[in-house]
């Protein structure tokens, strides 16, 4: 009986110790990073920053929501080449989206593709990917607002040859508004 109690105590203690080490490592790794230091680290390491194509499929999106999304992409602090491909997937409210498209059509980083009819999100993404030429492709939903350093952070992660894909942490803007989002 004493052997069983001792073994159990050792197992519980070991688990507690290993869990503490693991959680500490997670907390340390998850500390916010300074985006300018990420770019400086990449540049000092002689890394040529890859070109990034951001694809934004949209369908019947609210014009203000789409405008906020595109503004957040336009304001990225990424030092490399950034292109944005917006695919309107046959929206019925194109007359309302026209002014948003017009604003960004004059920005050489932006390309607007107007699909003749709704073909679905996946096919809209495929249309954007086929017209992309970037080293990396970032897919962004049309109702997403990116922090200014998102592209820089994702590119930094993609410099590791063992990494094949990277994604950001999503934070719902309405997370405190309703019981569904709390």
UniProtKB/Swiss-Prot annotation:
Membrane topology: Peripheral membrane protein
UniProt-listed InterPro entries: Glyco_trans_2-like, Nucleotide-diphossugar_trans
Keywords on record: Cell membrane, Glycosyltransferase, Membrane, Nodulation, Transferase
Biological processes, Gene Ontology terms: extracellular matrix assembly; hyaluronan biosynthetic process
Gene3D superfamilies reported in the protein's UniProt record: Spore Coat Polysaccharide Biosynthesis Protein SpsA, Chain A (3.90.550.10)
Record carries keyword Transferase: yes
Transmembrane segments: none
Cellular location(s): Cell membrane
E.C. designation(s): 2.4.1.-
Molecular-function GO term, any one: hyaluronan synthase activity
Role: Involved in the synthesis of Nod factor, a sulfated N-acyl-beta-1,4-tetrasaccharide of N-acetylglucosamine which initiates a series of events in the host plant species leading eventually to nodulation.
PANTHER family in the record: HYALURONAN SYNTHASE, MANNURONAN SYNTHASE
Family: Belongs to the NodC/HAS family.
UniProt protein name: N-acetylglucosaminyltransferase
Organism this protein belongs to: Bradyrhizobium elkanii
Taxonomic path: Bacteria, Pseudomonadati, Pseudomonadota, Alphaproteobacteria, Hyphomicrobiales
Gene name in the database record: nodC
């Amino acid at each position: 009986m004493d052997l069983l109690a001792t073994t159990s105590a050792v197992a519980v203690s070991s688990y507690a110790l290993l869990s503490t080490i693991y959680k500490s490592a997670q907390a340390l790794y998850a500390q916010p990073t300074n985006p300018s230091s990420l770019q400086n680290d990449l540049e000092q390491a002689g890394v040529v920053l890859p070109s990034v194509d951001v694809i934004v499929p949209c369908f019947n999106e609210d014009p203000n929501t789409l405008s906020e999304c595109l503004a957040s992409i336009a304001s990225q602090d990424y030092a490399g080449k950034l292109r944005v491909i917006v695919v309107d997937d046959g929206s019925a409210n194109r007359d309302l989206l026209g002014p948003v498209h017009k604003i960004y059509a004059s920005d050489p980083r932006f390309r607007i593709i107007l699909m003749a009819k709704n073909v679905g999100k996946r096919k809209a993404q495929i249309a954007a990917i086929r017209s992309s030429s970037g080293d990396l492709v970032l897919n962004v939903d049309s109702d997403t607002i990116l922090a200014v350093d998102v592209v820089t952070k994702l590119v930094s992660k993609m410099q590791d040859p063992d990494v094949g894909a990277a994604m950001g942490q999503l934070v719902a803007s309405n997370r405190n508004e309703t019981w569904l989002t709390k």
